[in-house]
Amino acid sequence: MTSVLIVVLNWNGIKDTEKCLDSLVHQTYRDFKILVVDNGSIDDSLERLRKIEKKYDKISLAINKHNKGFSGGANTGIKYALKRGFDAVTLFNNDAEADENWLAELVKGLKEPNTSIVTGLLLHEDGKTIDSTGDYYSTWGMPFPRNRGDNTDKAPESGFVFSGSGGASLYKTALFKEIGLFDESFFAYYEDVDVSFRTQLAGHKIYFTNKAIAYHKQGATSKKIPGFTVYQTFKNIPLLYTKNVPAGLLLPIGVRLFLLYVLIFANAVKKGSGVPAFKGWLASIRYFWTKSLWLRFSIQSNRKVSTSYINSIILHDLSPDQTGMRKFRKIFTGKA
């Protein structure tokens, strides 16, 4: 059997984490352990997590002294899995709950050819609509969730996708030995797409299974910090582009991304979020010169697939919510 470490991050969210863990310990697939990574909580999380650790043999606790974000917390769990010889590691949001067959279905997905990441059907907590079926990366330089907001009965068939959702996906541990861990510059948001992009460039595939079902209370952690999502978005979108887009696609995607970036920046200013947006942009410039540009050289020099292949698996369209960009789309595609 495939041995799996399920990694759950907690940051001042113990009530959600307790519900999450209750759903995980009752999985029908039994060759797993759970590692709860506490990301510097200042509430009563640690006290309650230590009690849970004593109650369940399958649960262990790792403590980060400060909040290292999703990417840093995930890396704590991945390093733990690598050190102890697990075959796979699953990242699961603490504000989510899993169907009892969720893990079993993810493991089955590893049987698909050349698959190193398996992602499932993540629903909103009421189960009526879809949160994610993986992620797209578009020719406009913007990643976004597949099928978000669609009715659950419209969930797509299982098959290969561009990116898995970091909140409920399974990764072969051997993959991280090859492509490296999560990039902690991202901290949170789009770090999962970055790993998936690097996975695709390295010649591995990512599989979506609609039978691995989980339920997500979207944004329960990020809502605690005003401006957090805006800052991370404006910082991370350029990093994702700089590191991963092949040279032959830099110009066509870059022109579109510039237009889209300006539009969403103007929208952020209009909504009173101009300061975190501007700070995010400045941070992206700093990371470009100090880290992402140098990482690009390594990633692209080790690329095992063609530019045409990457072009074939990205989405040649805008995300559904980018209504303001439709007027520009006609310039590039000839359609409104």
What are these regions (language model features)?
Residues I63-R84:
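Glycine-rich, basic loop-to-helix element that forms the pyrophosphate-binding segment
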Residues S23, D38-E47, H66, A96:
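A conserved acidic beta->alpha catalytic loop
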Residues V7, I206-S312:
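Active-site-adjacent helix/loop segment of glycosyltransferases
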